[in-house]
């Protein structure tokens, strides 16, 4: 599009430069095409979309991006926004003059256009993906020459970890995304921040659904994929089958004329690792990865948790700029001043450069894994940004979060409704919490419901116990250790606390609890038949039918149905079962017995009595 270049007050959000006639015609005729111009600012793009600048800024905030009316946007961000208005974004036919950004305007581009001279080569960020147990963490540990796998519970990496290694003088940052489908959100977020994806497939197995999920995440983000064919030391080798199947998903091997590198490795025996690292460096060289280490930092939150000594800590990966101790940062819906910073080896740092993973302390609230973080000018600006974000998401959060008002919950519990299992969930990190919430939401046992009343990061507190007691809830903790005083308090108040380090155990516990809540269903099962051959009248007792058991077994606890000429005369309980004068528990086929019924005396010879019992139907 052609924009009016005569805009004298671009610094003022109140003055909106007028678009050219060509742009006006695009709006008048609801044009579906917009030629991307890196000079276009937020207010200009908003006019093309036919919306106000405020609406566009709100949409950016919902994406976790802070902008003002005079800010430029990256093409991929514009394309994402344009989809909502059915507008196609195309490349310009000729190069545009680099725009002059206003001073102190935070940019959403990876590098500010007026700082291109400061661009420097940056290390690649590599995500290791694949199916559970195919060897992702083993590969990462082999590269780091450490052992972490044995410390993990259940054979699954519980959280995303980020680490930096050095090979031939070049640094490479690795992200290990958990392989189980429960961590789908975390894996998807991991794919968004990475430069290269290593897709691990075990050759003694096959391509799994999780393999394809990981593949699709990477392809959707247009990330180069390197396939690591792991466990080549195993006797069963399905390499050709795996290559053929992955080829159908546009991962044609180089040796077959494609562009996807397939590397045979044994992570356990550390075979093929150098080849993997060489290919990573080669791919990153082709990508020409660059960043500006002089500007304010921005990047992605990898994980967040509570530390006993530091309080709330978060793992950041810096994608651009320079993050320093003392910086004010916004991370999702949280903000704070960086008090301390350390690398994966707990070495204290004063700054972090592009592609570097660091653990920081100083945020006021727990951010979510995958949130964008960026440094801002001061705390006042950070507060304003976060306040606006929270205002925008308040309605959505209200729909997704369970009620926390105790009076409302108690009133809800008193009303008639389908049986529910109330749960209060506490976890060590935000990533674990999200994974558990997702899996709990999928639990289905009969028509019973799981009501997640509260879900939060941190250990179990006295408040949680009081809340669980009042709402009759099951209190579940994942990978946390409550204080002994808290456990004693729960015991005194008869509040059950379940603590696990393996997610599946929690899910199994919930399912078992739900099954125990199911109201049993019974069916009538015929136990025996008898023929009335004599009638005995006992004073003060009534008539006793002298019977011969023709079929099955008659029990003294059975129900009885008296039939005459195929007509049912009575249904009721056996009051007494006798043999001669003795009370007996049962009488088998071919034996005689006396039956006294509760509420029926009008027996006749040749009546048939059918006995039955109620049997619980297994779900």
Curated annotation (Swiss-Prot):
GO molecular function: GTP binding; GTPase activity; translation initiation factor activity
Record flagged with keyword Protein biosynthesis: yes
Organism of derivation: Onion yellows phytoplasma (strain OY-M)
Annotated stretches, region: G4: 230-233
Composition bias, Low complexity: 1-18, 98-111
Residues annotated to bind GTP: 130-137, 176-180, 230-233
GO cellular component terms attached to this protein's record: cytosol
Region: G3, residue numbers: 176-179
Annotated stretches, region: G2: 155-159
Name under which the protein is recorded: Translation initiation factor IF-2
CDD domains the record matches: IF2_eIF5B (cd01887), IF2_mtIF2_II (cd03702), mtIF2_IVc (cd03692)
PANTHER family given in the database record: TR-TYPE G DOMAIN-CONTAINING PROTEIN, TRANSLATION INITIATION FACTOR IF-2-RELATED
Highest taxon, organism lineage: Bacteria
Pfam families to which the protein is assigned, alphabetical: EF-G_D2, GTP_EFTU, IF-2, IF2_N
Disulfide cysteine pairs (residue numbers): none
Keywords: Cytoplasm, GTP-binding, Initiation factor, Nucleotide-binding, Protein biosynthesis
Domain tr-type G positions: 121-289
Compartment(s) of residence: Cytoplasm
């Amino acid at each position: 599009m052609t924009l009016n270049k005569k805009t004298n007050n671009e610094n003022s959000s109140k003055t909106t430069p007028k678009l050219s006639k060509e742009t006006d015609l695009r709006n008048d005729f609801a044009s579906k095409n917009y030629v991307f111009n890196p000079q276009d600012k937020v207010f200009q793009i908003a006019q093309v979309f036919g919306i106000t600048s405020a609406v566009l800024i709100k949409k950016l905030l919902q994406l976790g991006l802070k902008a003002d009316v005079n800010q430029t946007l990256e093409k991929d961000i514009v394309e994402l926004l344009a989809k909502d208005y059915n507008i196609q974004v195309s490349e310009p036919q000729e190069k545009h003059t680099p725009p002059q950004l206003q001073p102190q305007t935070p940019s959403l581009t990876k590098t500010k256009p007026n700082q291109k001279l400061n661009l420097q080569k940056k290390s690649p960020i590599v995500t290791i993906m694949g199916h559970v147990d195919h060897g992702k963490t083993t590969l990462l540990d082999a590269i780091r020459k450490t052992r972490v796998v044995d410390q993990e519970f259940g054979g699954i990496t519980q959280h995303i970890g980020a680490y930096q290694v050095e090979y031939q003088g070049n640094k490479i940052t690795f992200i290990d995304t958990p392989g189980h489908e429960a961590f789908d959100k975390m894996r998807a977020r991991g794919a968004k921040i990475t430069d290269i994806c290593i897709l691990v497939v075990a050759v003694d197995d096959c391509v799994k659904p999780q393999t394809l999920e990981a593949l699709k995440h990477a392809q959707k983000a247009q990330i180069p994929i390197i396939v690591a064919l792991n466990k080549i030391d195993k006797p069963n080798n399905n390499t050709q089958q795996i290559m053929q199947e992955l080829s159908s998903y546009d991962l044609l091997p180089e040796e077959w004329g494609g562009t996807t590198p397939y590397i045979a490795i044994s992570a356990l025996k550390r075979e093929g690792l150098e080849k993997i690292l060489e290919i990573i460096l080669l791919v990153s060289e082709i990508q020409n990865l660059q960043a500006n280490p002089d500007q304010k930092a921005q990047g992605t939150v990898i994980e967040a948790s509570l530390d006993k000594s530091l309080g709330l800590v978060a793992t950041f990966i810096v994608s651009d700029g320079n993050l320093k101790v003392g910086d004010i940062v916004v991370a999702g819906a949280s903000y704070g001043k960086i008090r301390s910073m350390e690398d994966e080896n707990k070495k204290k740092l004063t700054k972090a450069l592009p592609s570097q993973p660091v653990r920081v302390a100083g945020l006021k609230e727990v951010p979510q894994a995958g949130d964008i973080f960026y440094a801002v000018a001061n705390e006042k600006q950070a507060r304003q940004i976060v306040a606006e974000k929270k205002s925008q998401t308040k309605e959505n959060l209200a729909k997704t979060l369970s009620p926390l008002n105790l009076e409302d919950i108690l009133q809800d519990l008193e009303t008639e409704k389908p049986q529910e299992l109330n749960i209060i969930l506490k976890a060590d990190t935000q990533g674990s919490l999200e994974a558990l919430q997702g899996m709990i939401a999928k639990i289905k046992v009969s028509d019973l419901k799981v009501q997640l009343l509260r879900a939060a990061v941190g250990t179990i507190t006295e408040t949680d116990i009081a809340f669980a007691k009042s709402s009759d809830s099951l209190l579940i903790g994942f990978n946390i250790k409550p204080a002994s005083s808290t456990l004693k308090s729960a015991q005194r108040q008869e509040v059950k606390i379940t603590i696990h380090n393996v997610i599946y155990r929690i899910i199994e516990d919930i399912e078992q609890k739900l099954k125990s809540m199911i109201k049993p269903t019974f069916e009538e099962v015929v136990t025996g038949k008898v023929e009335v051959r004599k009638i005995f009248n006992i004073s003060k007792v009534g008539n006793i039918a002298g019977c011969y058991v023709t079929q099955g077994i008659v029990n003294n606890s059975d129900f009885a149905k008296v039939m005459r000429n195929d007509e049912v005369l009575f249904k009721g309980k056996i009051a007494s079962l006798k043999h001669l004068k003795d009370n007996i528990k049962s009488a088998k086929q071919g034996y005689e017995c006396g039956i006294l019924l509760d509420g029926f005396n009008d027996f006749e010879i040749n009546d048939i009595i059918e006995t039955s019992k109620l049997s619980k139907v297994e779900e």
